[in-house]
């Protein structure tokens, strides 16, 4: 059976037992990402800024009304959290295939590869949050007590991402074209999340508007904006629902991963 009575999730025990391997992998992911580049880790700041500039140029009139007078801050507070999701899910989906060599030679809990992807993505996200703070101060938003919710929202997003990539990475070992499908869905997913547009644009959009408002990433992105821009507490009921959903996806993802990992060596 898929779910055996008495079967336990050992993911947290694995994190503790293999913490040194996890630290090594996270450091390798972060350093390897910009290895050989002249600017090194500074690209963690430059990449989001370049993305913001592109969208600022491409959508100068269409979206300028979003977020009030400061669309630039509105854009940054949505784009950086979305980039965390996009890059980590993309890398996580191919993580098992990318590490086929070590998987065939060395035993260790394979989920460590996915956890390290999420942690390295989280570190890069936190570095990029410096950009958000800089722009918030530059445009007069400052900082408020609501910033205490930043680690909570980031943790919920990280758990959600981990659950998703546990499923996708294990399926990707068996389904050759899955990573390309995921890439397409992620591209479409940005437009199903209010990253570059205001939710008010969906007023009167009917079912589509309701679906986008119920999107867990919509709630997460708007929670970041509540923290950085609006200085109000995120909607705890909705955020709690996303946290519960993230935990459910994590449990399902772990079960799927452990079920399918037995065939990784043969499929890779």
What are these regions (language model features)?
Residues 1-268:
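Hydrophobic transmembrane alpha-helices and immediately adjacent juxtamembrane helices
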